[in-house]
Amino acid sequence: MLIYLAGPEVFLADAAAVVDTKRAVCARHGLTGVFATDLPMPADGLPEWHRLYRANEAQMRSCAALIANLTPFRGPSADPGTVYELGFMRGLGRPVFGYSNVAARFGSRTLAELGRSAWRRADGAWEDSAGMAVEDFDLHDNLMLDGGIRAAGGVFETAAVPEAARWHDLAAFARCVAAAARRLRNQPASASSA
């Protein structure tokens, strides 16, 4: 069964090695890991970014589920491309799962990023220098990510991983793969292609 593996690993210098290792974890659970880079881009004269976008969506449509690496990327939240992919698969009605190699909650990560440019309002909530409230529901990331994963029957696994291993530690990923394999084995065939 095909499972789309979303995440910013595609930006790593050793992306191919990480992809191979993740595929091996999936194979041990009877799944085939699919990455955005697997499908050749259409040669139709469109700009490269648009061809990548189209190839990524085609890959997702071919998969029964998604596992998203939601480890904070260039800020306190997940990679926006990965977030889009998670929402796309959720919109297709496919099971979605997530993991993060940072255990700190979204609210505390956001406050750490804002530093002294955040303060408490009179009602006790935090706000930033633009007067915007800081989301703090004690969740792993934005409520729409945690909520979408939960609504899809998925899990959101976390691990407190040292910074040096942030993009290579696969313990939380492996737990997601095991959960996805159990979920996909126990659902009717028509549900995985909805």
Predicted regions, residues:
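Conserved catalytic or regulatory cores that recognize and/or transform ribose-phosphate-containing ligands
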Residues: 1-194
